[in-house]
Amino acid sequence: MTTLNLSTLSERIKAHKTALVHIVKPPVCTERALHYTEMYQQHMDKPIPVRRALALAHHLTQRTIWIKHDELIIGNQASEVRAAPIFPEYTVSWIEKEIDDLADRPGAGFAVSEENKRVLHEICPWWRGQTVQDRCYGMFTDEQKGLLETGIIKAEGNMTSGDAHLAVNFPLLLEKGLDGLRDKVAERRSRINLTVLDDLHGEQFLKAIDIVLEAVSLHIERFAALAREMAATESRESRRDELLAMAENCDVIAHQPPTTFWQALQLCYFIQLILQIESNGHSVSFARMDQYLYPYYRRDVELNQSLDREHAIELLHSCWLKLLEVNKIRSGSHSKASAGSPLYQNVTIGGQTLINGEPMDAVNPLSYAILESCGRLRSTQPNLSVRYHAGMSNDFLDACVQVIRCGFGMPAFNNDEIVIPEFIKLGVEKEDAYDYAAIGCIETAVGGKWGYRCTGMSFINFARVMLAALEGGRDATSGKVFLPQEKALSAGNFDNFEEVMAAWDTQIRYYTRKSIEIEYVVDTMLEENVPDILCSALVDDCIERAKSIKQGGAKYDWVSGLQVGIANLGNSLAAVKKLVFEQGTIGQQQLAAALADDFDGLTHEQLRQRLINGAPKYGNDDDSVDMLLTRAYETYIAELKQYHNPRYGRGPIGGNYYAGTSSISANVPFGAATMATPDGRKAHTPLAEGASPASGTDHLGPTAVIGSVGKLPTEAILGGVLLNQKLNPSTLENDSDRQKLMVLLRTFFEVHKGWHIQYNIVSRETLLEAKKHPDQYRDLVVRVAGYSAFFTALSPDAQDDIIARTEHTL
């Protein structure tokens, strides 16, 4: 077995990481907001794609750039390290309300200078009524506004930020270079017919792409000039040589395809960076980096030996730390659902590739190097994912387990054995299906060929829908009734449990439809107001169709619906079925009263203990609850499948919705807005995250957990089935322990057809100490949901949720 070196960092990488993790309250940068406001005001007569292209070009020309001491990969998102830009075209309402108090946010604070406060208060009024969020609310019906106000459905994230959740076509970028892409645009423009309406609009889009690609080249040239300027005054010969090498790298990649590993990595980073300057959507991912960068790595490291492996890993480390510099500021309410300010920049390694039509293991030496580099650095970025398949070698799987043992929540695994065949059934071409990658958290798509948001825009609170189903359609939190029904626990008039399930079916169908209606509004406003030009230029077939991604330019386009509280739904239904209808030990009105009182008082607390201990719980491989949950979930899935997204029939293959369970950290704020539930959960406490069991209810170990998760209709949940597991570090102390985990992984993926799994390897005691003494644990990384975050950067509620998760042993 290969033993990875998981302890070595160069001195420069140590210094850069230490500096970054000790930025507790990052600054806010207003340069982008100012530049975009200037260009929007100057070019109100221009079509929106051209206006946005000119704004991005102006910003790339005028913004502050810098090269940090001794860094090897260059490019900055904002004027200061880890500063978060402001994107006023999406929203200004929360900015105006919260900007003066951003430093006081628990776990998500930002430092805002008085000058930046002044700038924002000066420019925000111009944007009022013109932002994406404003225009969404101008289109919502009163019913939709009411639903959003209650929080049963939440869709704030995409009204206040960009789409993203995709990977662009990095292989095409590396093959053609920026000038080659401009040639492709020019060729397509030569075939435009300005007497055809679609071509008239298409010409403006293609013109915008050309403006942006030229601006990207000029921007890279600015860094070449800066590196040379710094080299001229650098006293250390070794650093002077590095600066001149970086300048030469930039000279090449500003126009031409890269010729070395360093150049290829630098070009990919520049594009990754500018995508997140163009739009503030998160989960901009790299797709299968070990595949498209391997030819450069092989040439430099293995064949020419012009680059040694250790220096290649240092280049990767430098890139990973640049990803950590990228930052995003969210509204206070939205930040609670994305605890730790994650960017979800995923890198996928492993899996399979087709050789002469036959699948072959795709693991190569760069796969090991990327895995090892992440294991050494132990950062939150990139979000590292491994594609598992039955033919994966024990050597590589063992290497993955070695990195898991490092305790920073990576790598996560996705399963080729279910993703590939299900993608092919959807209509994805075989070659593309074998080239899928993890995007953001756990969702999957084909890099450079899939539209935005392979995970959804709106979250449904399953627990609140379930409570409404039990009480005649009344939302327990707000008291509002959106879809009235006759049957209610408080009336004691359910005749049998089948009527409870019928009530659930009715309510979830209603809320599912409403969530799609809301998504349609948000989708439409994003399409009309903020087309992403650079991003679309790097996704097939946007240039050929002369359409942005949002207009239907991508080859594929599926979107998943999202929900929170899956385990709470199953556990609650199981408790009602067993204790109320089968055993009759709890009366309908008795349960309703206990829920309304949040189990207050001795009698209600005793009833709560019966709900907790006397009914089966998801996560223990018990069909009586697992299959009931599946039955309830399938109603949601069937309803979701009926709908098409706004790109349907406009070009892409697909255009439908499917389910997904990537709840990020929304289980905490959603739980805070949810009253007591029949599984014994108290009001305002976190819901279960993803498809994981509710905290403290999975008593029979990890094997039972994967048994339960494997019963979910995974083949229909193509947005991903998120499973978090927490293991005590003592569980993986020796080779025999690692073998146990490898067997468990193979069983989960091959026998139970699991979609995804990830591990927290950290003790409860360590987490409690880190919460008590945060300054001593600034570099402690934990898995939150489908992403990792620095534990001390989380809010206290999010920290408590992770501490409360069941700690298993093998």
Which residues are covered by each model-predicted region?
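Extended non-globular scaffold/tether segments
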Residues: K207-L218
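Extended, non-transmembrane alpha-helical coiled-coils
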Residues: L218, R222-A225, E229
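Conserved catalytic cores of very large enzyme subunits
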Residues: T2-L206, S238-A245, N249-L810
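A conserved hydrophobic secondary-structure block that centers on an alpha-helix together
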Residues: A231-S238
